UniProtKB/Swiss-Prot annotation:
One of the GO biological process terms: regulation of neurotransmitter secretion
Name under which the protein is recorded: Multiple C2 and transmembrane domain-containing protein 2
Pfam families: C2, PRT_C
Keyword check for Cytoplasm: no
Entry binding sites for Ca(2+) 4: D525, D577, D579, D585
GO cellular component terms given for this protein: cytosol; membrane; nucleoplasm; synaptic vesicle membrane
Source species of the chain: Homo sapiens (Human)
Function (record text): Might play a role in the development of cardiac outflow tract.
Keywords, comma-separated and alphabetical: Calcium, Developmental protein, Membrane, Metal-binding, Repeat, Transmembrane, Transmembrane helix
Lineage start: Eukaryota, Metazoa, Chordata, Craniata, Vertebrata
Compositionally biased intervals (Polar residues): 134-145
Length: 878
């Protein structure tokens, strides 16, 4: 008999063994009082055929402590762990006896059967079959490692006869696969499925998709339009090395494996090319290297680079026992999910953390030729950071006098692109000239005055560029929280104490944010789940968490540290749903002013909509610590506020315009009512009121001194402090909650319209947009003055009281003429002392830190209730 093939009867018994074992176990469990069946089992059940020796008998007959020296001694060595109690040699035959005090014999046999038969198969199988079994075992291990870690509860697996029996049946069935499987795929029967092992090695000469001259590539493998695997992101590299291995199950070879490469950005992903592999062309059990050329029919690049990977296709039985994998997956689901969700790659951290600040002061232009343009402005770009200067009327020497701060990354190309643009009467924009600055070539901590000639036109730009190192930003886990270390916290507190108030005035403080978790988020995917991540913004500083996949209650447990440049900044935390290569979906947002932070206390914030005016679905848990120097914060209050990066311009909205008109109307009505009150006093409509007003007027005018002006304003602060205004958030919140403000797009696609009519439409739109902005500024200015006296921001109100008290004392002891003289000398000599100083109004800079009524509504913390979700409210109403 051929030793390589089992007998038909043995094969049939081997296939039915798992079913019989399961049935016997169920009977024993149902009748525990019934004694177990101790009938002797046929000795061929442990052998493939009559010609194969009984391995258990061979070991039993061997002298104890000495290996068996028979003809098959090299194949009958069984580990000592297999010789457990309950299996003893009865005689020279192969019958076994089981003790009634031990476990059921069928369980012990099932637990040892897989090992014994595997040894037997390896002993007598042909070399080709041995390679096939070994290959299948390797891929089983790879698939197990991808599905999750090994379970940490061995009693759940070792005691399961179903699992071991199915493993034994699988190994035996794999022996019946023909040895000529590598000749081609046409000879394979239809019930087979396949496992495709992909070793993603590297990419070469990929295309540039970022402004800094590099890309952040990652790879997606798709089959039938579904994404089966997504690689990690390699940041700032056109020759990335992934070195990732993945095993994908394949049901049919009549399809193509799509390989797509994307460039990862903060909000979207750019396409970098694709390729495909025809699965039917692959050879079984053979690893082949494939160099795939990337192509994109919509791109103008001829060479988009290549992707290098190894592919290996193996065959698996179609009726594979699925519960084997489901058991392991169920046992290790929590552990594998925890490892995947808590993984934040070092490359992602490195990509977010900047190590320097580039301060650029745009002073003026010299002999700039504007041509037919009527207005001019400057755009500055460093990587994906972009600023736009204010627009000035056409001039040969335009004076901008603006300052911009960029983040500097030492591992990236530090090329600053500067463009001068012009506008004509028809609002057409045209680039007038460009110039570049290599930031890496500039010295540190030194103001560099540069006169940069423009490339494509006459003229030059004069600016100051200063590169300052920055070491206050970090991303870490909860276990390595910076402020959790008492010594480090003491050191940071000492750095921002009052004794160091005049050292590095721009370094105001430090903010630490613990992003713990979110709950009850909106389901953005069709599966009823979301892939949420958090974006934290403090001014122009942005950091983000990793993505937690398929979860509406994600736990990030990350710690973010921001350097504070302005204590009046607002921390904006936005939750997005990652959507692959598409822009992320909005899941909620919350705005937290720094001065309203309660140190060291975990807080639950109700998420709001994009306009921060209505409650959205879900909550987020944050814990924040704020350490700052009050003197530095006060000095920074009277300097120009930091400009924001260029964002999409706001479009004309009728609802926003109506809201701003109402805001201006309220301020105007307050002034009108005051004038009517004075008029009523003059007309003696009320005798008592007019008498009191007349007496106050006579006493004030007779004894008036200049110090009384700040003193009167100080008394208003005291009055409102003693009797605080009820309802910090005005009634505007009620009207805004019932109004959904959405930007409306006004498009005109009719090609038959005359140019004159189009120009008129543009002109009217510009005028209305300007009126809208002016009305908003006026309304905000009046509301900020009111909120300053209402103690809306105690820090600013206290600072104003301190300044007014000092002004009262100064005006009391120093004559007015000397004060005016000092002020005039300071104004006239300011340019002589500092030629590059930027003019500003300290009072307006102070008021810009006070929130308006709209901002008060946006920054207000909503109360957490059981039905905080508007969706639940609607459902309950139905």
């Amino acid at each position: 008999m051929d030793l390589d093939k089992p007998s038909v009867w043995g094969s049939l018994k081997q296939r039915t063994r798992p079913l019989l074992i399961n049935l016997s176990k169920k009977k024993v469990k149902k009748n525990p009082s019934k004694p177990p069946d101790l009938r002797a089992r046929h000795h061929l059940d442990r052998r493939l055929s009559l010609s194969v020796p009984d391995l258990l008998e061979a070991e039993a007959l061997a002298p104890e402590g000495r290996p068996y020296s028979g003809p098959q001694s090299s194949y009958t060595s069984v580990p000592s762990s297999l010789s457990t109690a309950g299996i003893f040699p009865k005689s020279s035959s192969s019958s076994l006896k089981q003790s009634e005090e031990e476990l059921d014999w069928s369980q012990e046999e099932a637990s040892h059967l897989h090992v014994v038969e595997t040894d037997s198969e390896e002993a007598y199988a042909s070399p080709a079959e041995r390679r096939r079994v070994s290959s299948n075992g390797i891929f089983d291990l790879q698939k197990t490692s991808l599905g999750g870690d090994a379970p940490e509860e061995p009693e759940k697996l070792c005691g399961s006869s179903d699992l071991n029996a199915s493993m034994t049946s699988q190994h035996f069935e794999e022996q019946s696969v023909p040895g000529e499987a590598s000749d081609g795929l046409s000879n394979l029967p239809s019930p087979f499925a396949y496992l495709l092992t992909i070793h993603l090695k590297e990419g070469r000469n990929l295309v540039v998709r970022d402004r800094c001259g590099t890309s952040d590539p990652y790879v997606k493998f798709k089959l039938n339009g579904k994404t089966l695997y997504k690689s990690k992101v390699i940041y700032k590299n056109l020759n990335p090395v992934w070195d990732e291995i993945v095993v994908l199950p394949i049901q049919s070879l009549d399809q193509k494996l799509r390989v797509k490469v994307y460039d990862r950005d903060l909000t979207t992903s750019d396409f970098m090319g694709s390729a495909f592999v025809i699965l039917s062309d692959l050879e079984l059990n053979r690893t082949t290297e494939h160099i795939l050329k990337l192509e994109d029919p919509n791109s103008l690049e001829d060479d988009m680079g290549v992707i290098v990977l190894n592919l290996n296709l193996v065959v698996k039985q179609g009726d594979f026992k699925r519960h084997r994998w489901s058991n392991r997956k169920r046992l290790s689901a929590s552990k594998s999910s925890l490892i995947r969700n808590l993984r934040l790659s070092e490359s992602l951290k490195k990509n977010q953390l900047w190590n320097g600040i580039i301060s650029i002061t745009l002073l003026e232009g010299k002999n700039v030729s504007g041509g037919s343009m009527t207005e001019m402005f400057v755009q500055l770009k460093l990587g994906d950071q972009r600023y736009k200067s204010k627009t000035l009327c056409k001039s040969a020497n335009p004076q901008w006098q603006e300052q911009f701060d960029f983040h500097y990354f030492s591992d990236r190309m530090g090329i600053l692109d500067i463009e001068v643009w012009g506008k004509d009467n028809k609002k057409h924009e045209e680039r007038l000239g460009t110039c570049k600055v290599d930031i890496s070539a500039l010295p540190l901590k030194q103001a560099n005055c540069l006169e940069l000639p423009l490339d494509s036109c006459l003229g030059a730009l004069l600016m100051l560029v200063t590169l300052t190192p920055c070491a206050g930003v970090s991303v870490s886990d909860l276990c390595v929280c910076p402020l959790a270390d008492l010594s480090e916290r003491k050191q940071i507190t000492q750095r921002y104490c009052l004794q160091n108030s005049l050292k590095d005035v721009k370094d105001v403080g430090i903010l630490q944010v613990k992003v713990l978790k979110a709950a009850d988020l909106l389901a953005a995917d069709f599966s009823g789940k979301s892939d949420p991540f958090c974006l934290l913004e403090l001014g122009n500083d942005r950091l983000q968490t990793h993505t937690v996949y398929k979860n509406l209650n994600p736990e990030w447990n990350k710690v973010f540290t921001f350097p504070i440049k302005d204590i009046h900044d607002v921390l904006e935390v936005t939750v997005f749903d990652e959507d692959g290569d598409k822009p992320p979906d909005f899941l909620g947002k919350v705005a937290i002013p720094l001065l309203s932070i309660r140190d060291g206390q975990p807080n639950c914030y109700v998420l709001k909509n994009k306009d921060l005016e209505q409650a959205f679905k879900g909550v987020i848990y944050l814990e924040m610590d704020l350490i700052y120097n009050p003197v530095k914060a006060s000095i920074r209050t009277f300097t120009p506020r930091e400009k924001r990066f260029v964002e999409d311009s706001r479009k004309l909205s009728k609802k926003i315009l109506s809201r701003d008109v109402d805001r201006v109307k309220r301020i105007t009505m307050a002034i009108w009512n005051t004038m009517q009150f004075l008029k009523s006093c003059f007309q003696w409509e009320s005798t008592l009121r007019s008498t009191i007003a007349f007496a106050v007027f006579l006493i004030t005018v007779w004894n008036f001194e200049l110090y009384m002006i700040p003193l009167a304003l100080l008394l208003i602060f005291v009055y409102n402090f003693i009797r605080p205004v009820k309802g910090k958030v005005s009634s505007i919140q009620d009207s805004q909650e019932s109004t959904d403000i959405d930007d409306e797009e006004d498009e005109d696609d009719k090609e038959s319209e005359k140019k004159g009519l189009i120009e008129r439409i543009y002109m009217v739109q510009d005028i209305v947009s300007t009126v809208q902005n002016v009305l908003e500024e006026i309304a905000s200015f009046g509301e900020r003055i009111k909120n300053t006296f209402n103690w809306t921001v105690p820090f600013l109100s206290s600072l104003a009281c301190l300044i007014l008290a000092a002004a009262t004392i100064i005006l009391y002891f120093i004559p007015l003429r000397y004060i005016i003289l000092i002020w005039g000398i300071n104004k006239f000599t300011k340019k002589l002392r500092n030629p590059y100083s930027i003019d500003n109004n300290e009072l307006l800079d102070f008021l810009s830190r006070v929130p308006s009524d709209v901002q008060k509504v946006q920054y207000a913390e909503l109360k957490l209730c059981s039905s905080h979700s508007p969706l639940r409210k609607k459902r309950s109403a139905l």
